[in-house]
Design a protein with these regions (language model features):
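Cyclic nucleotide-binding regulatory domains
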Residues: 37-96
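Cyclic nucleotide-binding regulatory module and flanking cytosolic helices
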Residues: 1-35, 78-80, 85
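Short loop/turn motifs at secondary-structure junctions and domain boundaries
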Residues: 22-23, 39-43, 159
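Cyclic-nucleotide recognition modules
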Residues: 72-130, 134
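Polybasic "coupling" helices that flank or enter modular domains
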Residues: 115-182
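Short loop/turn microsegments at loop-to-beta-strand junctions
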Residues: 28, 46-47, 165
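Phosphate-/nucleic-acid-contacting segments
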Residues: 156-230
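A residue-level structural signature of the nucleotidyltransferase/glycosyltransferase Rossmann-like core
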Residues: 49, 71, 100-101, 166, ...
């Protein structure tokens, strides 16, 4: 909910369809969330749509057995909180200190009867669906190594870092996103490192140097390598 954040000045993001949607239509606020702060909770009224200025957000569900299933990672420029119903289906949390723009959903979608606005709304929805489809394809990989390699390839493409890829999420986040254990994710990353495909920098190994993107992409498609035993 909005009252969990601290408001600052009103601003507007600088992407084409977002500008078109929000020009003289939405009531805008610029909010900041500290890492680990809940932005909205599952089953809360879906009153707002969010776009990330900087930082990263995870959306997840807590399963009946207590496990956490992360449905998506949202990075700078991404829009989230678009629902086809009146409540949020996931909980959203800031992974790191994050700044977002927030618009009232009814102010945006209330104008969807206009042709141009409808097109812009559909573009935003299509992006959300694309992320969801990519996640389903990723979960359908046969091996854990393929899943981790595909995840790194996706993050590399989304973050567009030519040198060092600095992941905002930790290994527990990655494991909960891929449906794996932390130990399995760690073994997969270690194997990719041993194969010379990547190397690590930084204390927490979140800074990744991709030494061979082509090999990583091949690994994401089909891998004959086996993880070392735990």
């Amino acid at each position: 909910m909005v009252d969990r954040a601290s408001a600052s000045t009103n601003n507007q993001p600088q992407t084409s369809e977002w500008d078109a949607l929000t020009s003289e239509k939405a009531f805008w606020r610029d909010f900041k969330y500290l890492h680990g702060t809940e932005i909205f909770g599952e089953a809360e009224p879906a009153d707002y749509v969010y776009r990330i200025r900087s930082g990263a957000v995870r959306t997840f569900k807590l399963l009946p057995d207590g496990r956490r299933q992360i449905g998506a990672f949202h990075l700078s420029g991404d829009v989230f909180g678009i629902e086809n119903g009146d409540i949020y289906r996931f909980t959203a949390e800031a992974i790191v200190n994050t700044s977002v723009w927030i618009a009232k959903r009814r102010r945006i979608f209330g104008d969807a009867s206009e042709e141009n606005t409808t097109k812009d709304v559909l573009k935003l929805i299509a992006r959300s669906l694309n992320h969801a489809e990519n996640h389903l394809l990723l979960l359908g990989r046969q091996t854990s190594l393929e899943k981790v390699a595909a995840f790194l390839t996706e993050m590399d493409q989304r973050m567009g870092s030519p040198g060092v890829m600095i992941l905002p999420m930790n290994r527990r986040d990655i494991a909960d996103y891929l449906g794996l254990t932390i130990e399995t994710v760690s073994r997969a990353l270690s194997l990719l490192c041993c194969e010379g495909i990547l190397s690590f920098r930084g204390q927490h190994h979140r800074e990744i140097v991709l030494r061979s993107r082509s090999k990583l992409a091949q690994m994401a498609i089909l891998s004959d390598l086996k993880l070392p035993p735990s």
